[in-house]
Amino acid sequence: MNLKYLLLFFCLVQVLHYCYSHGDPSLSNELDRGLIPKCKLVPEQISFVLSTRENQNGVFLTLDNLSKGGILPKSDLSSIPVIFLIHGFISSANNSNYVDMTKALLEKNDCMVISIDWRDGACTHEFKILKFIGYPNAVKNTRAVGKYIADFTKLLMQKYKVSLANIRLIGHSLGAQIAGFAGKEYQKFKLGKYPEIIGLDPAGPLFKSNDCSERICETDAHYVQIIHTSNNLGTERTLGTVDFYVNNGYNQPGCYLSFLGEACSHTRAVKYFTECIRHECCLIGVPQSKNPQPVSKCTRKECVCIGLNAKTYPKTGSFYVPVESKAPYCNNKGKKI
């Protein structure tokens, strides 16, 4: 990400947040009419890319072709784990970080990975710097994408017998906020809750001061796992059942201490989680305190490992996670808990 664009992005988000939230409607209207990209979200253009061990290149799904049947490998998917993967701002499902995570998930388990591509609503196709100042409109699109995922989930369960117990949502940045909204929308069907939502450094700008109904929240699923890696593009606020603050939640090792480094830290959440899947690297979370205990003294009773098995640990709350600067990032000398 270009440094000058990132600097401008931070400045513009602050200005736009003031205009939209603090009552300067004339300026907001002018911005809406001209400067800010619309980043228009058309539900029909949201695609779901299905990857399996047999077809890792992906099959494009929509609510329309899914409802017609015959598009998925078989009609009874009750025993198959399903993982929704949701990208963030100015990104897409074919971003290399999500492709790497998809491969790691498929190597780990025989599952279906469904990557949600909402690139138009995420401002991905807008012109250069304009895509950055479209952020407020991308934020506005997140709830609609979340509802679409909830509708898609319901159809999967009704038509293909997918078990709710086998569904997990993983989202990065705005994608994490979308996962939270999907959890809220699905609960409106009165069919239960998603078992787990994993938020990888949930987007902070325009969400930090929101209450639970307007951001990812621990009530959105039975278990909500949050990985914090940046405090500007992300947020320091506790959001989930467990909140992991990697390197205290900011300035990740190996990322430069600059605005460009902030983007690096923000993306590290995805890389950390992928390494936890790929290498079964136990990034150990130690209960947060002024003087956190050494990782070497951790036991399963009071510490938790980031990853797909986090919810099998009894402890909840906030955790400090030390990491190394290079993959696989483990800073535990091979310790397992």
From Swiss-Prot:
Record's PANTHER family? Answer: LIPASE, LIPASE DOMAIN-CONTAINING PROTEIN-RELATED
Task: Give, as one word, the top-level EC class.
Answer: hydrolase
Query: Which EC number applies?
Result: 3.1.1.32
What is this protein's tissue specificity according to the annotation? Expressed by the venom gland.
Briefly, what is this protein's role? Catalyzes the hydrolysis of phosphatidylcholine with phospholipase A1 activity. May act as an allergen and induce hemolytic activity. In vivo, induces dose-dependent platelet aggregation (nanomolar concentration) and induces thrombosis.
Please provide one cellular component term from the Gene Ontology annotations of this protein.
extracellular space
State whether keyword Signal applies: yes
Q: Which domain of life is it from?
A: Eukaryota
| Signal peptide feature range | 1-21
Reaction(s) the record says it catalyses? a 1,2-diacyl-sn-glycero-3-phosphocholine + H2O = a 2-acyl-sn-glycero-3-phosphocholine + a fatty acid + H(+)
Disulfide bond sites: 39-123, 212-217, 255-264, 281-305, 282-330, 298-303
* Subcellular location per the Swiss-Prot or TrEMBL entry: Secreted
* Protein name per Swiss-Prot or TrEMBL: Probable phospholipase A1 magnifin
Q: Which GO terms describe its molecular function?
A: phospholipase A1 activity; toxin activity
One Gene Ontology term from the biological process aspect of the record: lipid catabolic process
The record's comment on protein family reads: Belongs to the AB hydrolase superfamily. Lipase family.
Q: Which residues form the propeptide?
A: 22-33
Q: Which CDD domains match?
A: Pancreat_lipase_like
What positions constitute the catalytic site?
Answer: 173, 201, 266
* A Pfam family matched in the record: Lipase
SUPFAM superfamilies found in the cross-reference section = alpha/beta-Hydrolases
Assigned keywords, A-Z:
Allergen, Disulfide bond, Hemostasis impairing toxin, Hydrolase, Lipid degradation, Lipid metabolism, Platelet aggregation activating toxin, Secreted, Signal, Toxin
